[in-house]
Structures are given as C-alpha cells and as structure tokens.
C-alpha cells in the first residue's frame, strides 16, 4: 500500500477566509430579503461510507500539491519522467490492507480507482469542474466532471479524464483515459438509499526499459541535452491495462421515521461489485541486448493476463443509541485470474493457466460515538475457498475541539500475495511460474497513532511483515541476467514510519514543513527498502489583489530524500523488482510556483526542478529512470456553479 499523507484539520480553517468570497462574482447580489446565499460549503461530497465533506474551491498548498494526474499529494512519491508513467513510492501505508489479492502490475495502479474512492454528491445547483495541466514535451491532461441533483433525492454525475504526453526520452508516449458515471438516491421517507456507478479506465503507454547507458545522462555532454538522443533499452514495446467496474450499494431501513428518534435503525444492506481487468504486454521487435532475457519467438509477442471478480456482501445492521451500530454480513468472492493457455516449462512440467474459485466469508463491523470518543472496529474471515484471508482492525479517536484530535488504531491482516506473484506466463522463457501451492500468506500487523492539533500534526506507524512477497532481480552471475523471480522473505520485517508537519505564519508569509523518518529492520535482507529521511519545505507569500478580486500565492517548494536501494521498474511485469546494485536519492528538487484564484478558477504556474539548470545530473526516479529536467508547467482547475 502506498503512503497517503493526511493533513488533518488545518486546511479546513485555512479555507474559511476564501469560502466567503467563492461565489461573489458568479451570482448577482441578492435583491430580496428571503434570497439564499450559497458557498462551496453547501456543495457536499459523500463517500460510500456516508462521510460528508464540502467541495473545496479554495487555493491552498494542499490544492497545489494535488494538481497532478492522480490527484494525490506527491510528498511520498517520485514521478517518472513523463506524465502517465508510474511513480516510485518513498513510503507505504498498512493502516488498511484488505484480505483479497490485488491484480498486480503495480506500476499501473495509480491510474485505476477503487469502488470506495468514487464520490457521490448532494448539490443545491448543478456543478461542473474542469482541470487542465500541460504535459511533458507535447501533450496535456484534461479532467472534466458534471453533477446535478435532478430532485433533492436523486443525484447523478459523469466524469471523463484524459491524458496524453510525449515525454522527453524515446519511446515513452503515454495515454490514460477514464470514464465514470453514477447516481445516488435517497427516498423521501429516508427508508431506501442506493449508490451506484460504472467505471471504464485504461492506461496505454510505450515502454523504453530505461537508459541503456546511464553515463550518457550523467556526464552532461551537450549532444545529450536533447534527451531524445539518449540510448534506451527497448523499442517497439507497449503495455496496456484496462478496467471495467459495475458497482451497486443499497440499503433499506425497516423502522418508520417515528421510531428512529435517537438514532435507532434496523437496516438490510447489500453491496455487489463486478470488475474485469486485462493487462497486455506487446513487442513488435525483440531486444537484441537481452534486456528481458531469452524468448520463445524472434518475432513479435503479445502476453495477456486477465482477472474477473464478482463480490457480494449481504447483511443486517442494528443501530441503538447506547450500543452504537453493529453490522453483521456474509460475503462471497468469485475470482478468475487467467493467462492465455497451459504452458510447459523446460523440464516438461505443466504450468496451469488459471486460478479460479468462489470463496465465502463472514464479517462484522461496530461503531460507537460517546462524548467526543469514536470507536470503529471490524473483522472479516474467509472460511471456504482457495485464497481465504483474515483481517481484524480497529481504531479509537478523541476530538478535543475543532482544532485538536487524536487517533490510535491497529490492523492485523493475513492474505495471499497479488495474483501476478502466484501465476504469470510469457513468451519470455524465464517469466513463467505458478506459486499458488507453495507461497504462504503475507502476515501484516500494524499499530498506529496520529495527533492533529492547532500547532501541527504527528503520526507514527509500526508494522511487522512476515512472508513479504517481492520480485527479485537475478544477478548476472546466476546465468539468469535480467530475469525477475517472485520470492518470499520468511523472516520478519519491522517497519517504522514517523511523520511530522508544522506550519509557521508571519503576516502574509508562511513556511510549511513536512518531515518523514523511516527505519526498517530485516536482518540485512534488503528486500523492503525506503529512504531513511524525506523532507519537504514550502516558503510562500499570499495576498489579495485588485480589491480582493484575486487571491495570489507564490513561493518555493524544496524536497529532498536520502539515498537508498530503490525498486527497479520491470516493463514486462509493469511492476517493481528488488535490486541492490544502485542507490538513488541524495538530491534536492526545488520548484517555483505562482498560483492565483479568480472567482472559482484556480491557476497554477510552476517552474519545476530549478537545480537541473546547474548541470549536475544525478537525479533518478528509479534505477536507470531519470527524474524530470527543469520544466515550465501550467495548470487550471475551474468550477462552474449555476
């Protein structure tokens, strides 16, 4: 799991100054005493867990950090050179794991959503959102969204995102597209609630395998300032992954409104999700340099792996004022992961091409709020099937006031590794395996705590991992050069992550600081690697201009992480592999930004990576994958409210 930076409660209070002017310029001044004034806080975003937040139209550092194709804070990530490529993760989050194996191909996961990440809305008027960002060399990103409440009970939404970027290096053209549409309905008598959506998402990009001769980049010769002249490992290689999902969650409340005073409810809940995923690796010409080893064919190849999943969850929830909410449910999980056909290895052994079954399980969830305390606990156990799995999780939080909150929790999970660790088939000879019978479950135990205060935020995670599963790059001396094999580390890995945030304000100036310290104990195995120190510091100035018609924000952002054995990207697997030959890191990235907000439009102007102008070419996103040179980027997010 990737690290997700939680900024806590602070941004809520920063937004209030801007919220009051959010709609001034797009609405006529009220002429009647009974007219209603709306702000962005009246436009609600709702999760499938019924958590509600306001649509954010303010200009904050958080908005700038998330102005990228995957809408995430980039503190714990290093992007590859081109938009649409993958990201190196600098930290990991095990607070919520899940008990089902993932598809794999983790290099593409950033561009695919999960059902719980799709938001629903309650809007007093229709809303449109456009987001734009210039690409690398040629291309751009455009994200568009429309939502409206046709009635107070029924909301629908449509979202389309597209990205196409050429990149500076050869053979890294990227194209990403996603479409989603859905609705939510809450009956007038508040007895029936439904949320549903359809998603169709795709990633298609060329793969160049990284630099063939890294010294061409590091020496800084003038002839290689044009990055398209650098030699790359692969040509004619394309990877593609697509996802389609149908999702419905609905519930019925048996108690009439007159019996629901005090929070009493008896609910029947049902959730169904069908998802199909396909991954293709195609190659029109075989690499003569043996980057991926020997193949069964000298002509073109096209590997394919697919996953079909159908998950059903049905249960009943009892809510009582003094007992909280208790939800008991049964679950079925159908899965069919398959490759193109039965394979016979060099020893004459048959390798199955499919992992298919239906697993059954039970689960319970309990929530209770009492005088500032909030308790959340859940457990799930798959009891019949092949993959099985167990998860027990809980957290306790206490809210002192609007600006101060603490939370502590635990998560214990046992699950099978991702499907591409268990089964993979390829026309490359050394990329064929089946490990369903000999790989053990990964066992993960995490305890964590966070404090969100008016002075700053602090979080601590301590994780123990047993049977950690990874791809291991084989050394040249083994005779299997450039082969990546799945393996399990049967020892224990202890992983500590400590993150602190503090902001200092003086008049119109601000200095925001985020510092992350990490330590891993693994008996010198070097299979789980992260930088020990990562820091980001942003010095900025803010002011209103033109009689408060525009809000201006400008400054510098500095980021640095210590060197470590970063995972290497494997273009055949679309995944990352462990290597211990090359460290990356120990370089800084400074960006200049000039941002502005006019009405409900936010403009982001950035000059990225100023250090690249100094001519020291030691900046890598992953082994053999350089980070970006200095770039001038433009981004826009624009909301329209009728």
Show which residues each predicted segment covers.
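A generic local structural motif
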Residues: 1, 116, 590-591
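Single conserved hydrophobic/aromatic residue that forms the stacking wall/gate
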Residues: 1-16
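Glycine-centered flexibility sites
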Residues: 8-10, 167, 635
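Loop/helix-junction capping segments adjacent to catalytic residues or to phosphate/diphosphate-binding pockets
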Residues: 12, 140, 386-387
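Membrane-proximal, glycine/serine-rich, low-complexity loop/turn segments characteristic
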Residues: 17-241, 255-263, 397-403, 624-630, ...
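Short linear interaction motifs
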Residues: 111-112, 140, 230-232, 248, ...
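Exposed, low-structure sequence patches enriched in small/polar residues
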Residues: 123-125, 240-285, 299-642
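Solvent-exposed loop segments that connect transmembrane elements
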Residues: 212, 219-223, 290, 294, ...
